[in-house]
């Protein structure tokens, strides 16, 4: 199955860069999602400090569930350090709110994740760190 990662020129790719992240696909010229194999993503992203993804479920996903989905996920540094963040679109209004103000709504979450302590105290609106 394919992994879909945001291209470097996509809205999400640019938001990562605006939030001060060293996005591993920043140099990619695509303005949308890029379908890649797990092996390609792992080869390039295994040492990334953070792993963010979106999903839709009734309850939040955990690291244990993620590992049981595919054991190789545990090979990512972000998994090993607990820096995996999920946006459960079944629980938060990501797709209804962010198209109108991605720079304000999503960017704040990304800054909170990538640079804790920079913004005043508060919690992410869309992304949540996966629990064990």
Task: Go through each PLM region and give its residues.
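Generic detector of well-ordered alpha-helical segments enriched in charged/polar residues
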Residues: 64-67, 108-111, 128
């Amino acid at each position: 199955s394919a992994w879909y990662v945001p291209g470097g020129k996509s809205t999400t790719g640019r938001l990562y860069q605006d939030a001060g992240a060293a996005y591993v696909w920043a140099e990619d010229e695509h303005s949308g999602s890029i379908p890649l194999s797990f092996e390609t993503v792992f080869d390039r992203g295994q040492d990334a400090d953070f792993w963010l993804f979106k999903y839709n479920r009734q309850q939040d996903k955990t690291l244990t569930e993620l590992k049981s989905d595919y054991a190789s996920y545990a090979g990512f540094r972000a998994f090993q350090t607990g820096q995996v963040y999920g946006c459960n679109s079944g629980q938060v209004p990501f797709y209804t709110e962010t198209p109108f103000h991605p720079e304000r709504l999503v960017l704040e979450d990304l800054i909170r994740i990538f640079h804790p302590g920079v913004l005043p105290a508060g919690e992410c609106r869309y992304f949540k760190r996966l629990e064990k």
